[in-house]
Amino acid sequence: MTESRVLDGNAAGGLLLELFGVDLTAAPCVCGGCGAREEVARLDVYVDCPGVVIRCRHCENVLITIVRGPTRTWVDLAGTRGLELG
C-alpha cells in the first residue's frame, strides 16, 4: 500500500472557491471529533483518493469530502461541527 501525500488546505482552495463562491482558506473550521478550531488552509488535504478528503490535523477526523462526477459534485461536511464564513 502506498502512502497518501498530505497537502495543506490551500491545495483545496480553488475547488472550494468554485463550489461555494467564496475563498474558504481563511475560514475557521471546527472539528466534530476533537473540537479543534483551525483555518481551512491549516487542515490536512488528501488528493490521492477518490475525490478530495480534508482531515483535522489534530485527530485525523475526516471533516470534508468532495467527490466530482461527470454531471454532479458530492460534498460531505459531516465531520465538521461548524465552518465560519465571513
Feature locations, PLM:
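Short linker/helix segments within small regulatory modules
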Residues: 44-53
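Cys/His-rich zinc-coordinating "finger" modules and their low-complexity flanking regions
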Residues: 2-4
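Short Cys/His-rich "knuckle" micro-motifs
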Residues: 38-45, 66-69
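Short metal-binding segments enriched for Cys and/or His
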Residues: 58-74, 85
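Short cysteine-rich clusters marking metal-coordination/redox-active sites
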Residues: 31-34, 56-59
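Extended interfacial segments that mediate partner engagement and assembly in macromolecular machines
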Residues: 80-86
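Short Cys/His-rich Zn2+-coordinating modules
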Residues: 8-21, 36-42
